Amino acid sequence: MHINHISVGNRLLPLSFQCAAGEKVYVAGPNGSGKSTLLSAIAGTLSSREGVKGEVLINETSLLTLPLAEQAIYRAYLCQQSRPAFNVDVFQMLALSLPAGRHVVEPEVQAAVRRVVELVQLQDKLHRSVQALSGGEWQRVRLAAVCLQVWRSLNPYSQLLILDEPAAPLDVAQAKWLYQLIDEMAAQGLVVIVANHDLNRVYQHADKVLLLNQGVLTAYGSADEVMSVENLQQVFETPVKKVAVDGQPYLIFT
């Protein structure tokens, strides 16, 4: 996948990068750095009237030139937290999220739903109204739904999953399930782009890191390359240390 000279007015200055199938790309940066703007621009949810320029190429398909309904064949996008717009139970919500032409009675669909429900631990919530869920429960439903849209066995055209701060409403245990779900989607061959404010999670889970500051691409590459003490101190304007715990590197901000 190639992102070529994507920009959004003065909120996001032109930037380009590319990533391979199955890569997990984490977008990091301070509040207001342009993370959500970048993700929504890649997802095609911003119009040209909002100053969007550039292209997103997926296997030579120019994603942003397609109508939104056609874009949804190739990519799924989870924006930041929203409340349910209507009252259905969790199972119905998941059924509504299936790719066009797929039905819950199909064995392949049932297997995919079982797997994603297991990954985010929704087994006991399937017949509960979405209006009765806590914030963390609703976020897990949203995650399951967006993943079913591009679940590779149900949608062979799917290429890209975009998640904007998906861990924000989740507790520690639920966040663990989220990262397992992201690993599952990447293992299916999708590019997964995630905005995340937890820099230690970014460091531990990313194949590539894209570091933004004030709408400008500061660095792009492996976590070790991008998340250097020098880069992080420059962007976040706070002292940073790297320490090892049981052989695993961690960042400490002081």
From Swiss-Prot:
Instruction: Cite the binding residues for ATP.
Output: G29, P30, N31, G32, S33, G34, K35, S36
GO cellular component labels: plasma membrane
Keyword Membrane on entry: yes
Instruction: Quote any Pfam family the record assigns.
Output: ABC_tran
Q: What is its main location?
A: membrane
Report the residue ranges that make up the ABC transporter domain in this protein.
1-239
Q: Which InterPro entries match?
A: AAA+_ATPase (IPR003593), ABC_transporter-like_ATP-bd (IPR003439), ABC_transptr_BtuD (IPR023693), Metal_Ion_Import_ABC (IPR050153), P-loop_NTPase (IPR027417)
Q: Which residues cross the membrane?
A: none
Q: Where in the cell is it found?
A: Cell inner membrane
Which keywords, in A-to-Z order, does the entry hold?
ATP-binding, Cell inner membrane, Cell membrane, Membrane, Nucleotide-binding, Translocase, Transport
Catalytic reaction equation(s): an R-cob(III)alamin(out) + ATP + H2O = an R-cob(III)alamin(in) + ADP + phosphate + H(+)
PROSITE patterns referenced in this protein's UniProt entry, alphabetically: ABC_TRANSPORTER_2
Q: EC number(s) per UniProt?
A: 7.6.2.8
**CDD domains named in the record:** ABC_Iron-Siderophores_B12_Hemin
Gene Ontology MF term list: ABC-type vitamin B12 transporter activity; ATP binding; ATP hydrolysis activity
Q: What is the top EC class of this enzyme, as a single word?
A: translocase
NCBIfam families per UniProt: PRK03695.1
**How does this polypeptide assemble, per the annotation?**
The complex is composed of two ATP-binding proteins (BtuD), two transmembrane proteins (BtuC) and a solute-binding protein (BtuF).
The family note in this entry says:
Belongs to the ABC transporter superfamily. Vitamin B12 importer (TC 3.A.1.13.1) family.
State its role: Part of the ABC transporter complex BtuCDF involved in vitamin B12 import. Responsible for energy coupling to the transport system.
> Protein name, please?
Vitamin B12 import ATP-binding protein BtuD
| Organism of provenance | Vibrio vulnificus (strain YJ016)
Q: Tell me what gene encodes this.
A: btuD
